[in-house]
Amino acid sequence: MGRIIDTDGKPFSFDPEMQSAALDIPQIASRYIEHPASGITPNRAAQCLRGAERGDLIAQSDLAADIEEKDTHLFAELGKRRLAIQGVPWSIEPPPNASANEKKDAEMLDEYLHSADWFDAMLFDATDAILKGYSCMEIEHGMLGKMHIIRAIRWRDSGHFCLNPDDLSELRLRDGSHSGVAFQPFGWIVHQSRSRTGYGGATGLVRTLIWPFIFKNYSVRDLAEFLEVYGLPMKVGKYPSGATPEQKSALMRAVMDIGRRTGGIIPAGMSLEFQAAANGQADPFETMISWGERSISKAILGGTLTTEAGDKGARSLGEVHNEVRREI
């Protein structure tokens, strides 16, 4: 194998073996992913975000994956932004005043990458950084004849990484130590997305999206309880004076059972009445849910009219918002 040189023309040692298979890293990588969004509260969310600011990315990473999985609106809006990159044309161009060899190399690389079956998946996996702030993919090397090639690109769980405690802008691979281990040269593709200015653990959209997610889901839960109370007719069983405890229990079972089935039986001399459902308005809950979804759309796409027309959603406004989305 020929020597590999850096951008300054200096050779360096290169290990083609995958770094994640070395040392104690496989034990770190075998962790179970937590689901911190279950029953999430503002205080618990703040703890996850503060941990990431200090270099511990695990809780925030799991939180980001959890809200993307649980919120269909967030998933759809994020998917629009992630998939948009697939349609952007690209090419490998030689540098200015390139030599004949440089032009030939650029042409060869362009042809190779356009034909690589892993390239589109790698682009999509890189956009995981939009939500989490970073996405790390490990390179699997191989040989094709005498040519050194990339055989595959393996996405790695974002919880497998940490920040260098001496430089919170530097991502490192977790190995069980306090500071982690630096990425080996030519072993990784690392994309760090900046939705806001900050260090490595504070640039992902998850830090903005978690708040409308929490308040929206409070209202979704409250709406479900509201519909359970106000959306069904009240069932009232009446028993005659002197009914035995066994008869009362039989009537109660009939009242509860008939709510799940279309028929039932009750003891003779007893009656079952259906009363109109209690009056109530779901508008406050729906308003809060709508606010949460609009806030999510604004944070991800820069607007809302590419998702829903709204009360005054004119076509021209929708086109303006679509241009904003494309620019993002």
Task: Give the location of each predicted region.
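Structured, contiguous alpha/beta core segments that scaffold functional sites
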Residues: 2-57, 63-74, 92-258
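Active-site acidic/histidine clusters and adjacent loop/turn architecture
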Residues: 82, 90-93
